[in-house]
Amino acid sequence: MAKDFVTGKHTRFGNTRSHALNHSRRSWKPNLQKVRILVDGKPKRVWVSARALKSGKVTRV
């Protein structure tokens, strides 16, 4: 399963509920992008969430 290298976000699981309170399993997936960033001074290709990219927590190489 892909996981955000910066924030640790990954797929979350839960239930979807109808008005009659029936339930079925569903998942919430973060918007992950595979980008090249500097890790310990070397370029590395990792999964990063779009939110981390937009907020400037990482910069592309």
From Swiss-Prot:
Pfam families: Ribosomal_L28. Coiled coil: none annotated. GO terms for cellular component: ribonucleoprotein complex; ribosome. GO terms for biological process: translation. InterPro entries: Bacterial_rp_bL28, Ribosomal_bL28, Ribosomal_bL28/bL31-like_sf, Ribosomal_bL28_bact-type, Ribosomal_bL28_sf. SUPFAM superfamilies: L28p-like. Keywords: Ribonucleoprotein, Ribosomal protein. Residues 1-26 are annotated as: Disordered. It comes from the Bacteria. GO terms for molecular function: structural constituent of ribosome. NCBIfam families: L28. Belongs to the bacterial ribosomal protein bL28 family. This is Large ribosomal subunit protein bL28. It comes from Pediococcus pentosaceus (strain ATCC 25745 / CCUG 21536 / LMG 10740 / 183-1w).
